[in-house]
Amino acid sequence: MFAAQYIGNKSFNVVEGHAIAPQAGEVRLDVGYVGICGTDMHIYHGVMDQRVSIPQTIGHEISGVVAQIGEGVEGFTVGEKVVVRPLDWCGECPTCEAGLTHICQNLKFMGIDTPGAFQSSWTVKARTLHKLPAGVDLKQGALVEPLSVACHDVRRSRLKAGEKAVILGGGPIGQLVAAVAKSVGAEVLVSEPNDSRREFADELGVKSVNPMDTDLAAYVDQWTGTKGADVVFEVSGVLPAIQSMTQIAGRRGRIVMVAIHSTAPPIDLFQFFWKELELLGARVYEAADFDWAIELIASGQIDLKPFISSVSPLADIGSAFANMDGNPQGMKALVECNAEQ
């Protein structure tokens, strides 16, 4: 088997090794495709070197095929297509005992804190697996993880049909949030300065606006008939969006924090009092979000094919990262880890 190891300084080594036989409760996968995530790009830029052990095999947006099953594992057979929910929770802390394993107090994120998926063979705990139905191929399967992020965001927002949602930021996650929001019957507006990303939103069938040349608050006021947005998703991670989110939310609107802000941004707390706003955090996903994401793909409600910008072999992972780094128009780059599949 081969694995791509991040070695720092925007560099990878592809090394040959041995597949790890599954222990009790584990399954070994032949990895199909792995998506390059925004978090992977942060690692690539060295932002997370203090957290990520170097060298490390990163990657967590993965589809694959069951190759070997460990003792005690039930419900899976060799040859089945699966995806991995890349969270390793302790099961013992108060948060896990409350059923919130995705925000476990001792959570390890696979592909960041522990070895990840940019390898041809990956052995994981069976509890992290979700099956793919026959109609969902491995390329689409590699996007189940980011789609699950969007499903969790929308589920946290309590968004319903007929409501109006504004998404601040039209990157891959923002566009997936737009797609999920549209699937529940909401009217959707994506605020994004990048021309190609606004075009992508338009092709998804949602509205878009450039906040750099349009007064966003005035635009939303007109779009909603002065009511304001029912839900605002902050997906950009930039300060202007933080300033806008409280302005454009309507009375008793819900604001969902999706982006990670590295420094504490100033927030207009007066608007929370004046409008009775809600601020909701949304971190990763739960099992139900993976199930929902798979159903959205299998039912045809969301087509993920337009999100795939490129596919590269594992041997060319360095070029795949470099190309994504220089392509702000790109959505999702996939790395193919077993070309024969």
UniProtKB/Swiss-Prot annotation:
**Could you tell me what reaction this enzyme catalyses?**
2-dehydro-3-deoxy-L-galactonate + NAD(+) = 3-deoxy-D-glycero-2,5-hexodiulosonate + NADH + H(+)
According to UniProt, the name of this protein is: 2-dehydro-3-deoxy-L-galactonate 5-dehydrogenase
Q: How is the cofactor bound?
A: Binds 2 Zn(2+) ions per subunit.
EC id: 1.1.1.389
Quick one: which residues bind Zn(2+) 1? C37, H60, E61
In this chain, Zn(2+) 2 is annotated as bound at C90, C93, C96, C104
Keyword presence, Oxidoreductase: yes
**Disulfide-linked positions:** none
Q: Which GO terms describe its molecular function?
A: oxidoreductase activity, acting on the CH-OH group of donors, NAD or NADP as acceptor; zinc ion binding
Keyword match S-adenosyl-L-methionine: no
Q: Which domain of life is it from?
A: Bacteria
Cofactors (names): Zn(2+)
PANTHER family on file? L-THREONINE 3-DEHYDROGENASE (PTHR43401:SF2)
Q: Pfam families recorded for this chain?
A: ADH_N (PF08240), ADH_zinc_N (PF00107)
Protein family according to the UniProt entry? Belongs to the zinc-containing alcohol dehydrogenase family.
Query: What SMART domains does this protein's entry cite?
Result: PKS_ER
Q: What does this protein do?
A: Involved in the degradation of 3,6-anhydro-L-galactose, which is the major monomeric sugar of red macroalgae. Catalyzes the third step of the pathway, the NAD(+)-dependent oxidation of 2-dehydro-3-deoxy-L-galactonate (L-KDGal) to 3-deoxy-D-glycero-2,5-hexodiulosonate (L-DDGal).
Q: Which residues are tagged with the site Important for catalytic activity for the proton relay mechanism but does not participate directly in the coordination of zinc atom?
A: E145
Active site at: T39, H42
- What is the native source organism of this protein? Pseudoalteromonas atlantica (strain T6c / ATCC BAA-1087)
* Keyword list, A-Z: Carbohydrate metabolism, Metal-binding, NAD, Oxidoreductase, Zinc
What taxonomic lineage is listed for the species of origin?
Answer: Bacteria, Pseudomonadati, Pseudomonadota, Gammaproteobacteria, Alteromonadales
